[in-house]
C-alpha cells in the first residue's frame, strides 16, 4: 500500500540512520544529519467514520510493526458530541485496552485522539471543564484545532465579527 509506505518512509526520513537508510541520507544531504526524534505521527485530519477507522488500523499496525514506540494520533473529526466523534473515541479506548497501540510512547499513552472544534464563544466557555472527567485509560486527547468564531454554530462570518474579544475569552476559558 503506497499510503502505508509513505508513512514508513516519513518516519525513516525523520529518525533513520543516514549510513543505513536512503531516506535518512536524504535528510542528511538536506543539511540535517541528526535524527529529528519524531515520536508521534498524525494519521488523517478531520477524518471519521468506519472507513477511516479501518484505514487508521491498517496504517497504525504497519507503523507499530516497525516502530512500536511511535504514538499514532487518530482523528476524531470536527463535531464534538456527534456519533462520528464517539466512534473514534470508542475505537481509541478499545485499542488502548489491548496491546495494539504504542508500547512506550513519549506521553505514556497507547494512542492520542485529535479533536477539532469550531463553535461560538459561548460554547467554548461552557466547555471549560470538558476534559476534566475524560477517562485516563491510555487514550490521550489532543485538541489540535479550534476556533471560537461561530462558523459552525451558524453565525454569519464577517471580517469584523470573526475574531473578537468575546471569542478570545471563550477560547481562554476553554484552555483553563
Regions found by a protein language model. Name each.
Residues 1-66, 70, 74, 80-87:
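N-terminal catalytic cores of secreted or lumenal carbohydrate-active enzymes
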Residues 32-33, 77-122:
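Substrate-binding cleft/loops of secretory-pathway carbohydrate-active enzymes
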Residues 61-62, 68-71, 100-176:
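Catalytic-core region of carbohydrate-active enzymes that cleave or remodel glycosidic bonds
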Residues 42-47, 76-79, 117-119, 145-150:
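Short, flexible loop/turn elements at secondary-structure junctions
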Residues 25-26, 82-92, 124-130, 171-174:
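Short alpha-helical segments and helix-capping/turn motifs at coil-helix boundaries
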Amino acid at each position: 500500500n503506497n499510503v502505508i509506505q509513505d508513512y514508513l518512509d516519513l518516519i525513516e526520513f525523520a529518525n533513520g540512520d543516514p549510513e543505513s537508510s536512503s531516506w535518512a541520507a536524504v535528510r542528511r544531504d538536506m543539511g540535517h544529519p541528526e535524527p529529528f526524534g519524531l515520536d508521534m505521527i498524525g494519521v488523517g485530519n478531520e477524518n471519521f467514520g468506519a472507513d477511516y477507522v479501518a484505514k487508521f488500523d491498517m496504517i497504525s499496525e504497519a507503523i507499530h510493526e516497525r516502530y512500536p514506540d511511535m504514538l499514532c494520533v487518530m482523528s476524531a473529526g470536527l463535531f464534538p458530541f456527534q456519533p462520528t466523534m464517539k466512534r473514534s473515541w470508542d475505537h481509541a479506548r478499545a485499542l488502548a485496552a489491548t496491546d495494539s497501540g504504542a508500547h512506550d510512547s513519549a506521553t505514556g499513552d497507547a494512542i492520542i485522539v485529535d479533536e477539532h472544534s469550531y463553535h461560538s464563544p459561548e460554547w467554548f466557555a461552557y466547555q471549560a471543564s470538558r476534559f476534566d472527567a475524560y477517562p485516563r485509560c491510555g487514550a490521550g486527547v489532543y485538541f489540535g484545532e479550534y476556533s471560537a468564531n461561530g462558523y459552525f454554530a451558524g453565525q454569519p462570518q464577517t471580517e469584523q465579527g470573526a475574531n473578537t474579544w468575546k471569542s478570545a475569552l471563550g477560547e481562554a476559558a476553554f484552555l483553563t
